[in-house]
């Protein structure tokens, strides 16, 4: 599995436009062969930072995706950014879920009072 993350920061006047373009791409990228997930996230503390995430079943699927026409639209969005993006590409060999947390901490549930819930 391969994860591609693109972190971008925009000026106030271009962020909404960039987000709108990226939102239109989520479905088409997600429907590409080999894509298991596509997400667009906006930073809750700095609303002008966007993160685009794609997860691919294989490196070959991702390479094919980079050559696709729709990737050119993402490159165009990068041109709107206030500076160069931060790019992260992780080649993941395994993924674990909450069972790892339980394995490390044991299966002791958090007390409601620890969570501020009574």
Where are these regions (language model features)?
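Short, flexible segments with low predicted structural confidence
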Residues: 1-2, 17, 33-34
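Short, well-ordered beta-strand segments in beta-rich or mixed alpha/beta enzyme
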Residues: 2-8, 37-66
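Short, surface-exposed ligand-recognition loops at beta-strand->loop->(often short) alpha-helix junctions
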Residues: 9-19
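Non-catalytic surface loops within mature trypsin-like serine protease
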Residues: 10-12, 58, 91-94
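An amphipathic, aromatic/His-enriched active-site/gating alpha helix that lines ligand/cofactor pockets
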Residues: 24-36, 55-88
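Glycine-rich beta-strand-turn "strand-cap" elements at beta-sheet edges
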Residues: 41-46, 75-118
């Amino acid at each position: 599995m391969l994860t591609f993350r693109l972190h971008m920061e925009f000026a106030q006047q271009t962020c909404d436009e960039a987000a709108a373009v990226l939102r239109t791409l989520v479905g088409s990228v997600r429907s590409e062969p080999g894509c298991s997930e596509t997400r667009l996230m906006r930073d809750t503390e700095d609303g002008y930072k966007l993160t685009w995430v794609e997860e691919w079943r294989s490196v070959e699927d991702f390479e094919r995706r980079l050559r696709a026409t729709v990737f050119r639209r993402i490159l165009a969005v990068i041109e709107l950014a206030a500076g160069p993006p931060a790019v992260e590409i992780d080649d993941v060999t395994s993924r674990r879920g909450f069972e790892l947390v339980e394995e490390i901490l044991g299966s002791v549930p958090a007390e409601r009072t620890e969570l501020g819930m009574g």
